[in-house]
Amino acid sequence: HLRNHFGSKPFKCNKCNYACVNKSMLNSHMKSHTNVYQYRCADCTYATKY
């Protein structure tokens, strides 16, 4: 929790300059670097990664 107050972002992406305060946020961000769309609408062509 204190990382939020001090601005510490120890979890860094190895593909871009993104950094965050916890590993789960980094894991979510890493999906942006893939071409995998996990969630697709059954009624139209809409799809999203997360």
Swiss-Prot record:
Molecular-function GO terms, alphabetical: DNA binding; zinc ion binding
InterPro entries: Znf-C2H2_CTCF, Znf_C2H2_sf, Znf_C2H2_type
Keywords on record: Developmental protein, DNA-binding, Gap protein, Metal-binding, Nucleus, Repeat, Zinc, Zinc-finger
Annotated localization: Nucleus
Coarse class of the protein's main subcellular location: nucleus
GO cellular component: nucleus
Zn finger intervals (C2H2-type): 1-5, 11-33, 39-50
UniProt keyword Oxidoreductase, yes or no: no
GO biological process: regulation of gene expression; segmentation
Protein family membership: Belongs to the hunchback C2H2-type zinc-finger protein family.
Function: Gap class segmentation protein that controls development of head structures.
Entry protein name: Protein hunchback
Organism: Platynereis dumerilii (Dumeril's clam worm)
Gene: hb
